[in-house]
Structure formats: structure tokens, C-alpha cells
């Protein structure tokens, strides 16, 4: 899919949610899709962009069909970094309410930081590293990824009154602390 084609399609879709990750139980695409079914009632033009690949891809696509959400969910597997970055930049909320699956736990949430660079706030899960990358209720929200109502209400509260705009602005400021130049200066000051 070309960048122009995607951009013209996205012009009519809002709000825009995005996940960039492996299709893996721990990443919790299922709960986002189930929440999307309810969000669609209030926001009929909502779209969920899924970028990635993995073992759960077919199960996730089957769930989208089962819930009749094919016009709300866009899948991208093998795309250029330019297209990926453009899709992130054109999104409103980065969504990855990770959970603990078996013994697998989300590490530091670099994907949340990458989204924040574009001024995109995140919804992350309470389990794992999301809270290291998301300042709850300032740069995004942390929810219980195991609880569908919490995933839904967290997304709804970010969308309502376009709260994601304020959270995104804060996220862009917050992420600047992860930039190498600042880290190097901090170490120089400590060592001197």
C-alpha cells in the first residue's frame, strides 16, 4: 500500500488508533479489537491500524471478521520505515495494553517512546515496562490489560473531548528526556 493511498484513506477515518508490535498474546491485540467493537458505536469512523506479524496474526484477523470490524481495522505486515513512521505520525493514540502471558512480560516500552516522538500518547498495560515510558494521565494512560472494561474506558476517556491532543503534547515533551544528547550531558555533569 502506497503512502498516498493510505493518507487519502485516513483522511476520512478518525479517531485513529495504532499498534506496532508482533502479533503475540502478550501484546493484547484481542482486547483492543473487542473494545473497538464498542467504541465503533460512539465513533463510527474509528480505525485501528495494526503493524506487525507473528503467531497470533490469523487469530486476530479471524476475531476482526467475527466482530464485523473489517472496515475499522487495517493490517500492515511488510512495510517501509517511512510508511510505518508516517502511519504513527498520523495516528491519535498508540495502543498496546500488554499483559503477562505465561511467563512472558513486556520489557521497557520503547514503542511507546517512539510514538511519543511524534506527539502520540499511549495506552499501555499495567504489567511490564509501559509505566517506565508512560507518565499515567499525563502522557497517556496505564490500564489493566486483562480487563476489557478498563481497556475500553481508558480509550474512550482519551478520545472523549480529544484529550489525546493534550496527552500527546505532554508525551512529546516527556520523550525528550530519552534523547541521547541529554543523557550524555547528564553523565558529563555527574563525572565532573
Q: What spans do the regions from the language model cover?
A:
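Conserved donor-nucleotide binding/catalytic region of nucleotide-linked donor-dependent transferases
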Residues: 6-8, 13, 43, 155-173
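Acidic donor-binding loop of glycosyltransferase active sites
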Residues: 89-104, 120
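Conserved donor-binding/catalytic core segment of Leloir-type glycosyltransferases
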Residues: 6-27, 33-36, 49
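Short hydrophobic beta-strand element within catalytic cores of glycosyltransferases
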Residues: 112, 117, 121-124, 134
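Nucleotide-sugar-dependent
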Residues: 99-113, 131-132
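Nucleotide-activated donor-binding/catalytic signature segment of Leloir-type glycosyltransferases, i.e.
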Residues: 14, 61-79, 83, 93
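Conserved acidic donor-binding segment of nucleotide-sugar-dependent glycosyltransferases
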Residues: 135-137, 141-148, 157-162
Amino acid at each position: 500500500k502506497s503512502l498516498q493511498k493510505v493518507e487519502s484513506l485516513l483522511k476520512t477515518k478518525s479517531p485513529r488508533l495504532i499498534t506496532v508490535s508482533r502479533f503475540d498474546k502478550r501484546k493484547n491485540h484481542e482486547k483492543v479489537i473487542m473494545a473497538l467493537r464498542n467504541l465503533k458505536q460512539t465513533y463510527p469512523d474509528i480505525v485501528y491500524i495494526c503493524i506487525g506479524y507473528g503467531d497470533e496474526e490469523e487469530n486476530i484477523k479471524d476475531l476482526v471478521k467475527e466482530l464485523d470490524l473489517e472496515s475499522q481495522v487495517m493490517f500492515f505486515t511488510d512495510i517501509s520505515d517511512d510508511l510505518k513512521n508516517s502511519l504513527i505520525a498520523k495516528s491519535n493514540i498508540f495502543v498496546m495494553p500488554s499483559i503477562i502471558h505465561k511467563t512472558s512480560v513486556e520489557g521497557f516500552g520503547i514503542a511507546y517512546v517512539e510514538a511519543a516522538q511524534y506527539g502520540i500518547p499511549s495506552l499501555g498495560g499495567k504489567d511490564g515496562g509501559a509505566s517506565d515510558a508512560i507518565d499515567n494521565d499525563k502522557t497517556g494512560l496505564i490500564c489493566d490489560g486483562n480487563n476489557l472494561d478498563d481497556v475500553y474506558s481508558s480509550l474512550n476517556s482519551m478520545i472523549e473531548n480529544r484529550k489525546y491532543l493534550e496527552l500527546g503534547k505532554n508525551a512529546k515533551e516527556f520523550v525528550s528526556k530519552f534523547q541521547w544528547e541529554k543523557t550524555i550531558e547528564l553523565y558529563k555533569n555527574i563525572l565532573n
